[in-house]
């Protein structure tokens, strides 16, 4: 496990105040939006037919729906993130109070994990692969010393859901489909933006541009994981993020079945390890 660059500028929770409305559109993955969200796969089409569809259907639709979203004031982004001292032991990952954070190597807690874990404020228990290389997410965090884990929660806002209900109830299913797809991708764009901010904060954006306007959605240092996926399948662990980041202050809530509302919202944990990657268990 490699050590994260120091110093970390703060520990605990922070709300990203930067106006990211227009910025978010530049972070949208349009291939996913058009093919997966809107269902335009282009299968069986020639290169010329695909380009014609892009020029005459998809891009005009995108610009029109974007204009409607802005005109109606639907997009109200919230970006919350935080840094918490962390340790791992086997499959478990322990989070500690921000007061145990450090600003120099001399301040890093190095007492044994057996002693330190008694002070943990939250614990994750991740599954481990039963085949080589036997990975678990906990492997990407130091065991013999305190490390840092980043948490994120972002939302495109509750007005999307209300407007989508209006469209659906009116039988305007095509427009509902377009608005819903773009709203979901705006939430994903916000997740990418806050992840980029984390890489900038931690000094691990060395191979990409050094501002939020420098879009980099692949081949970056570290990895972002959302609960419910194979490496961290326990949806109930989302409550840890809610307990620490307190997104309820911004109208973001967790249901009894651990679904996030509004729907155009997402949470994640961020590993800064350079070898962190997506994997199945």
Task: Outline where the language-model segments fall.
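Active-site loops and adjacent core secondary-structure elements that bind or stabilize anionic groups
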Residues: 1-177, 202-204, 212, 252-264, ...
């Amino acid at each position: 496990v490699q050590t994260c660059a120091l110093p970390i500028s703060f520990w605990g929770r922070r709300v990203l105040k930067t106006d990211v409305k227009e910025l978010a559109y530049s972070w949208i993955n349009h291939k996913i939006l058009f093919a997966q969200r809107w269902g335009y796969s282009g299968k069986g089409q020639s290169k010329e037919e695909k380009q014609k569809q892009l020029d005459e259907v998809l891009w005009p639709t995108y610009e029109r729906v974007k204009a409607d979203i802005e005109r109606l004031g639907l997009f109200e982004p919230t970006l919350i993130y935080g840094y918490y001292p962390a340790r791992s032991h086997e499959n478990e990952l322990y989070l500690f109070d921000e007061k145990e954070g450090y600003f120099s190597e001399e301040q890093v807690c190095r007492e044994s994990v057996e002693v330190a874990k008694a002070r943990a404020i939250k614990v994750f228990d991740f599954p481990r692969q039963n085949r080589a290389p036997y990975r678990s997410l906990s492997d990407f965090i130091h065991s013999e010393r305190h490390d840092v884990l980043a948490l994120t929660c972002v939302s495109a806002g509750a007005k999307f859901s209300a407007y989508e209900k209006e469209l659906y109830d009116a039988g305007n299913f095509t427009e509902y489909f377009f608005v819903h797809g773009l709203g979901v991708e705006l939430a994903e764009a916000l997740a990418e933006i806050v992840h980029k901010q984390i890489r900038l904060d931690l000094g691990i954006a060395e191979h990409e541009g050094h501002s939020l306007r420098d879009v980099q959605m692949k081949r970056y240092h570290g990895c972002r994981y959302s609960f419910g996926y194979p490496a961290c399948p326990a949806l109930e662990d989302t409550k840890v993020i809610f307990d620490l980041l307190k997104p309820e202050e911004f109208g973001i809530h967790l249901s009894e079945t651990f679904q996030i509302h509004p729907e155009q919202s997402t949470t994640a944990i961020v590993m800064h390890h350079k070898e962190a990657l997506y994997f199945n268990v």
